[in-house]
């Protein structure tokens, strides 16, 4: 029996997804005073999103969710945990 978690239970930082990959937000570890901005833009636990691309130097990260594209700093994307689809 393998001890590797199945893909459906694996949780990874948003910034670790490859461009074109999708995931479901499971946790947002951004401090409360910054988290409100993301919540207002629709990034909630349970939201399905797609990592669109990284800027040429890797920062920012462009994400598609709820019908629009959102750019996040890489350090913010590292604090959003997703379950890859």
Model-derived regions: residue spans:
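Extended boundary segments
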Residues: 1-17, 76-81, 85
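Amphipathic, hydrophobic secondary-structure cores in small proteins
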Residues: 19-75
């Amino acid at each position: 029996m393998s001890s590797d978690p199945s893909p459906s239970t694996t949780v990874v930082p948003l910034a670790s997804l490859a461009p074109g990959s999708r995931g479901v937000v499971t946790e947002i570890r951004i401090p409360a005073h910054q988290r409100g901005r993301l919540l207002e833009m629709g990034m909630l636990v349970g939201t399905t999103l797609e990592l669109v691309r990284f800027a040429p130097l890797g920062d920012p990260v462009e994400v598609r969710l709820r019908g629009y594209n959102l750019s996040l700093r890489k350090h913010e994307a590292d604090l959003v945990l997703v379950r890859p689809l």
